[in-house]
Amino acid sequence: MRIGYFLSSEEFGPRELVRQARMAEQAGFDGLWISDHFHPWNDEQGHSGFVWSTIGAIAQATSQMKLTTAVTCPTVRIHPAIIAQAAATSAVLLEGRFALGLGSGEALNEHILGDRWPAVDTRLEMLEEAVEVIRTLWQGGMQSHRGRHYQVENARIYDLPEQLPPILISGFGSKSTSLAARIGDGYCTVGPDAEAVESFRSQAGGGKLVAGGMKACVAKTEEEARETVYRLWPNEALPGELAQVLPTPAHFEQASELVSAEQASEDVPCGPDPERQLEAIQAYADAGFDELYIQQIGDQQEPFFELYANEILPRFNDSKPQQGVFVGEGARA
């Protein structure tokens, strides 16, 4: 299983994300995920830059790692034709190192233009048609599309990459997993769910990528790490479909008052012990994932990269960390 780094656009500004991307490459991570949000989940996280601008900067700051959006919603806030152009441009800049991760989105980000937030079945239907629009435009030449949800009239993407990026579909339930198997080049999810992986593979056939995301918090003590997780990411422990339907960071903050500190960090490896990190990672390997992308919660980025370069990545990735690279690169932004 290959190990990558998960860049959090909700928790860090664009300049800091570029800095983290450089450190991740130097530490020996195999790839990058980057989240795409209009809003953070809560005000404490405090950021949400425009991901496509950040991707352009990362393309120039790195030279080896694949970069995947994790994930972009191409259905409500941004028309899939615009996503098709943005992804094509990113693929040109990254020269074969870009993958487009797509999902059905959350009201938190997609409600901002006043559009009605659709029911889950409609959202999946829109996602399927959005992928059709994107792939149609990636064929090159003048294209039109007249579907149930989207219209495209005489549109052409002039800058297409030599190698079209794969499209990964995010899934958290049986319906979205089946959709990913049917229309995606790969599948991405969070949590070491072996049943979901098996369901995807049984429907998709062989050869399609399965990638996962995981949060971690490296700190001087386990207690400090758990406090950091609770302060920044209590929303991760919210049950059911709340993450898809709550419309603002304030609503997430209100709902998160029902989450205890223990619940918030229950599934997050916390503290300085590499064995705790390895145990959490191994669960994904045992579940059958091909790739795992790990997000460090909080501002202890240098200790995280040091620990992973020296203790974690050598057990999984083929790449070796460079020496002397974990020096601060200026103030975070």
For each feature predicted by the language model, list its residue ranges.
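Active-site-adjacent structural elements that line small-molecule/cofactor binding pockets in enzymes
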Residues: M1-A333
